[in-house]
């Protein structure tokens, strides 16, 4: 509608009954969708019914079947920088898979290429370190700098997992990737108000115990994608009785 002017007004919202039609299209296009609902019974009030945001659907945080792919993780990532080292964490909210790592910029970029996160949390303070990379900046969502405080991050990690140390996960307490892991937890609890009880384990991706491949090798071996439908190498472990191999 023109709203009384000679130019069109961009779409800002749509009725709830059209949710199934538009939600997956908007989120797959990289947009963030806030779902607003009535917060009180209209029969019990004579005033305007209160409405509020009850859910926030973003590219990296969704449980909608139309958005998720059954044989592919949907990762939310977070990146932080400290003393020329990069920390990276990845969480699939739908499965609870939670990973962290640390290393050089090239190593982190290699992990990003392999995991293909749909949304990336980063502070504007650290953005300059990624300015010359080929990461799609439209995937970025900026978080506050206070989340980068190491002590704050450690406390958040301890509180979430109800532990007094991360040694049980095989992770050194000085691992800077813990900051990015905490960023994800803060973001989901504050912006999305998600219950994360199913996120009960944190796994470190260690460069010394991993076989790293650059994007050209992965492409040439057709591990994740193939020029022919159904021809990628991961198809070989998808025909199993267990669901785990399809998301390895």
Identify the meaning behind each predicted range:
Residues 1-242:
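Charged catalytic and DNA/RNA-contacting regions of genome-maintenance
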Residues 243-247:
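A short, hydrophobic C-terminal helix/tail in secreted or cell-surface proteins
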């Amino acid at each position: 509608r023109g709203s009384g002017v000679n130019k069109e007004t961009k779409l800002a919202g749509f009725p709830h009954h059209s949710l199934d039609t538009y939600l997956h299209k908007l989120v797959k296009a990289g947009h963030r969708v806030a779902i607003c609902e009535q917060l009180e019974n209209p029969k019990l009030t004579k005033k305007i019914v209160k409405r509020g945001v009850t859910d926030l659907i973003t590219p990296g945080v969704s449980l909608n079947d139309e958005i998720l792919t059954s044989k592919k993780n949907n990762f939310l990532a977070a990146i932080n920088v400290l003393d020329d080292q990069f920390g990276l964490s990845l969480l699939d909210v739908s499965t609870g898979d939670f990973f962290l790592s640390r290393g050089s910029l090239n190593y982190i970029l290699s992990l990003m290429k392999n995991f293909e996160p749909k949304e990336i949390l980063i502070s504007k303070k650290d953005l300059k370190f990624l300015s010359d990379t080929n990461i799609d900046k439209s995937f970025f969502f900026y978080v506050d700098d206070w989340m980068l405080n190491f002590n704050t991050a450690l406390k958040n990690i301890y509180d979430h997992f109800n532990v007094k140390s991360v040694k049980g996960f095989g992770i050194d307490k000085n691992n800077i990737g813990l900051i990015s892991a905490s960023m994800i937890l803060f973001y989901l609890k504050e912006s999305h108000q998600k219950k994360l009880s199913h996120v009960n384990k944190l796994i470190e991706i260690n460069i010394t115990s991993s076989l790293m491949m650059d994007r050209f090798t992965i492409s040439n071996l057709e591990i994740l994608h193939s020029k022919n439908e159904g021809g990628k190498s991961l198809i070989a472990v998808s025909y199993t009785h267990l669901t785990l191999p399809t998301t390895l």
